[in-house]
């Protein structure tokens, strides 16, 4: 096993931290909300999880770092058994178009431009490879949707998608998806 492959199997340790805000619980899972108003320790943890998640995606930069100056960014970290097992990073962005799945499949640009409208955008939705196929990504996104008070179907979605990410977005938004600026 290569070092890169080994890194992908190691979860990020996540014990309870002072000041954390647990916003959802089910079975053995908790979701902790982190923002730029959270403690340094929580923001550093969110960055470690975002860097771990980046290993499983086509992105070259993490969806969140401590240096992120966006006061509105929201990071949702799923914890189970003292390990971070899921992540959703949302931030408000202007959306400028609707991409139908027909246009996406035919590699056409979004056919329906819209006036720029602020909308929460999913920068990343990730679950640890050992925790996939359990509905965790959907549960974390539902928690995020409740927290930002916006339906999942109206979120913008950052691309590119992994194959499993595209399948997930197709399930969440069967007609198509909003494209952020």
Protein language model features and the residues they cover:
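Non-catalytic substrate-recognition and accessory regions of acyl/acetyltransferase enzymes
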Residues: 1-129, 143-181
């Amino acid at each position: 096993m290569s070092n890169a492959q080994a890194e992908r199997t190691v979860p990020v340790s996540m014990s309870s931290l002072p000041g954390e805000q647990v916003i959802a619980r089910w079975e053995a899972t908790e979701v902790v909300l982190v923002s730029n108003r959270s403690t340094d320790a929580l923001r550093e943890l969110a960055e470690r999880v975002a860097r771990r998640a980046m290993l499983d995606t086509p992105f070259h930069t993490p969806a969140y770092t401590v240096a992120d100056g966006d006061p509105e960014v929201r990071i949702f970290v799923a914890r189970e058994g003292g390990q971070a097992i899921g992540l959703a990073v949302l931030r408000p962005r202007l959306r400028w178009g609707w991409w139908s799945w027909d246009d996406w499949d035919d590699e056409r640009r979004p056919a329906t431009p819209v006036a720029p409208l602020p909308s929460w955008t999913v920068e990343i939705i990730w679950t640890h490879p050992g925790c996939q196929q359990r509905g965790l990504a959907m549960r974390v996104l539902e928690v995020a949707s409740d927290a930002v008070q916006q339906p999942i179907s109206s979120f913008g979605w950052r691309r590119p998608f992994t194959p499993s990410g595209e399948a997930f977005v197709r399930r969440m938004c069967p007609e198509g998806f909003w494209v952020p600026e």
